[in-house]
Amino acid sequence: MKGGTMAHIQLIYGDEPQLIEEEKRKFLSAYPDLPVTVLDDEAGPQKISEKLCEDSLFGDQKVFCLVNLPIIRKSGKNSDAWVPLYELIMEYNGNNPILLIYHDMIDKRIKQNKAILDKIPNHQCKRLEGADLVMWIRQYCTSNGFKMTPDAQEYVAHLIDLWQDVPVSFMRTEFDRYFLQITGDKVITKEFLEENGSDYG
């Protein structure tokens, strides 16, 4: 873009709400002093465009969190009403950081979607499976000051295999509960998991 740098815009998308929530917190933590304005598709393209432009004029800085807007297209569903907002965001050079959140995967075959992904820094949060989910759990334990024994990790991997498609949010809730139950050594063992685990599904 000529003159001025592109404002800080990021797109977070995917089918794993827990990871989207984590990425959202990360983005917002960079702007602790700014109020957050959340707008979704119900606000309508015109109102959102007005908000983005009016704030550029009046200079009250804030973070815009724009959720599930049809500027990201699905095949067979096109809404021309959103095109001006799409163009505004693609060329946006105001001062307000914008976080775009889209709770689904994005069809990259659609030209407009591909253009968004090419232009705007983005982070995909897709369902974690198998080893990736075990890795997430290990990191989550570590960040809370807990360790898992190797046989506990194997046990968790086995459960994840068995359950198929278990969301991160379920595992997070489970482990939050374990953290509260364990006193003394912050170690999660296979025996503990066998005695205290919930059954998914």
Residue ranges with predicted function:
Residues 2-201:
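Non-catalytic interfacial helical region
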